[in-house]
């Protein structure tokens, strides 16, 4: 055995583990187990503003990281109070896709983030969260594109999630793409997903 053999064996083992992990990734959608995870629901939330989230450092993961686990900030729960601007109720993965902004009438593409509520099939807590949102926003009278007639202020509580699926590489560098209207920066790919609780905001 040469002096380099142990290092070579370790490198080959690491490659094998990585390959095995890639081969066993059977998620039906991007990072699906993380998106429907209820294990953080009892964690006390930290208050955060949309403007704060738009400064968070993006993760490096992309669409190829279909089974990436939660790390760092993604293991924390936050409560954000913001104005609901658009709700899409019929996404392919069954989530309720909600676009929110910190201010009532700021242009959404320049200032929005997304929060998402999974289908009730993944936990009764999501049925409750959808019922809570429907009690604050009339989800039966949305525009064809999901827009509200007038923004409604709501507090959403959920786990932070970086949607690296929409982090794209081009000749000019990395950028956000096709993340609803919320593509102002890579930091706009931060979401609260899943949402565990939806309430009316507490007064000043």
Q: What feature does the model see in each segment?
A:
Residues 18-22:
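Sec/Tat signal peptide C-region and signal peptidase I cleavage site
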Residues 1-9:
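Bacterial N-terminal signal peptides that target proteins for export
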Residues 23-204:
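OB-fold and OB-like single-stranded nucleic-acid-recognition modules
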Residues 8-13, 17:
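Hydrophobic helical h-region of N-terminal Sec-dependent signal peptides
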């Amino acid at each position: 055995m040469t002096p380099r053999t142990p290092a070579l064996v370790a490198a080959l083992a690491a490659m094998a583990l990585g390959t095995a992990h890639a081969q066993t990734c059977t998620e039906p959608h991007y990072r699906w187990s993380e998106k429907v995870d209820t294990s953080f629901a009892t964690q006390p939330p930290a208050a955060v503003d949309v403007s704060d989230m738009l400064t968070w450092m993006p993760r490096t993961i992309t669409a190829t990281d279909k089974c990436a686990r939660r790390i760092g900030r993604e293991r924390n729960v936050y409560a954000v109070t913001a104005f609901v601007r658009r709700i899409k109720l019929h996404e392919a993965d069954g989530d309720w896709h909600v676009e929110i902004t910190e201010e009532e009438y700021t242009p959404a593409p320049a200032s929005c983030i997304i929060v998402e509520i999974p289908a009730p099939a993944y936990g009764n807590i999501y049925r409750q969260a959808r019922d809570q949102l429907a009690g604050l926003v009339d989800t039966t009278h949305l525009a064809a594109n999901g827009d509200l007639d007038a923004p409604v202020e709501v507090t959403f509580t959920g786990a932070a999630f970086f949607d690296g699926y929409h982090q794209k590489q081009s000749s000019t560098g990395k950028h956000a793409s096709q993340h609803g209207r919320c593509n102002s920066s890579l930091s706009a790919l931060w979401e609260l997903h899943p949402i565990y609780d939806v309430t009316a905001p507490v007064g000043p």
